[in-house]
Amino acid sequence: MVIKKEMKTEYVKPLVYTDRVKRQIVVYAILSFIITFLLTKNLHNYLNLVGIISIYLPYLLIYLVAIITNPIENAIKKGFENEARDILKNDDNLIKIGITGSFGKTTTKNVVNDIISSKYLTLITPASYNTPMGITRTIREMYKPIYQVFICEMGADHVGEITYLMDFVKPKYGIVTSIGPQHLNAFGNLDNIIKEKMEEIERLPKDGVGIINLDNEYIANYKINNTCKVLSVGIENDKADFSAYDIKYSNAGTTFKVKLDGKAATFKTILLGSHNVTNILCGIALARELGLSKEEIIDGVANIKQVQHRLEIKKINGFTFIDNAFNSNPVGCKRSLEVLSMMNGKRVIVTPGLVDLGKEEANENYAFGAYMKDRADNVILVGEKNTEAIYRGLKDSGFDINNVKVVNSEKEAFNEVYTKYSVKDTILLENDLPDAFIH
């Protein structure tokens, strides 16, 4: 069976000894030598004690290594960061863009880059590099004076982190993609999340430009404490400065219209989902501020590349998969289902459910299950325990439970797909997937 061939392939990252690990190994070895020497020097007097200590010695050594090396590592880290700050500070002509949000950051970052790179030489934080060290590494290792724009993804799962990154990068342009209960445990409550994400706009300079998603209720209801220019985007939203309408989906992607210069402009993209239309609107709004013409923006949108594992269309063994395996969330999963509902053949969703939602996890998964009604024909749930709330949501919504299959592993899920469905069907993979598929 094809799935067995897929699952047999192993994708394991090779072990890499970083400079930090090497320093820790050296300290560990020195401490081991010293303690072993002291214990064995008078071994005959402390034989019983040596036996007891040897059991706990590895834990003691790890603790001591951390105590000794942490100040050194922090100093090195701070030095690297200061070097990155100086690089940004010394380039007065560099246009800096910050992008944050509970979800949609990475996709929006890539969308912005694809749209404006026809006019500007851009430096972009790779993958999901959105922490101080990730940003520092990007600047130190990839920056060159020829770059005209720095597009920086900014992540946060604790209060104060966006403030820190804004002080670090000092962008003139800021985008807040969306806000929701992501990392709720770390933030404590939703109000902290809202306030933290909106720091992206509130800490822009007075001549800066903020771009916000007006369809997000938390953003729309937030009173921004800044006098900088703020542009809004939305879908069929008359209050938004940039609004998309006449949206159509197919296996080839999405088409939609936006009014530019008072006239309707038609955009085509390979990306799927209304949330991706919102992400593109953010890119369109920013591109206008950066001086791109309507034609340049239309071409830029058409050239947007798919982002791996974010509603990415894949053809494997003749089957059509919609891969949304990366970091599914309460908003994104509903958008995925909306896309699935417009596809041909049987509409199948494979999911292990939503995670990292704190006390709201069960409620959000229940709502996720209920939302599948009329949007999916068949459901494959991976893991009985963690998908129990989804199952209840499906059942209570009136979904035909005979079309729900609960399996214990991703391998079983793929077996189900390849044996029960045909190449005419569409399979949505929502949230984490096995390495054999992802790679």
Predicted segments, located by residue:
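A polyampholytic, Gly/Pro-enriched intrinsically disordered region
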Residues: 145-150, 251-255, 422-434
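ATP-dependent carboxylate-amine ligase
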Residues: 1-70, 227, 285-294, 299-439
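Short, surface-exposed amphipathic charged segments that create phosphate/polyanion-binding patches used
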Residues: 139-141, 190, 241-253, 414-426
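Acidic, Mg2+-coordinating active-site environments of NTP-dependent enzymes
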Residues: 176-321, 345, 370-378, 387-405
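Conserved strand-to-helix beginnings and helix N-cap segments that scaffold or border functional pockets
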Residues: 136, 162, 187-190, 280, ...
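Fold-independent oxyanion-binding glycine-rich loops
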Residues: 100-102, 126-127, 154-155, 178-179, ...
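Glycine-/small-residue-rich active-site loops that bind phosphorylated ligands and cofactors
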Residues: 104, 130, 157, 182, ...
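Phosphate-binding loop of NTP-binding sites
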Residues: 1-27, 33-214, 218-228, 287, ...
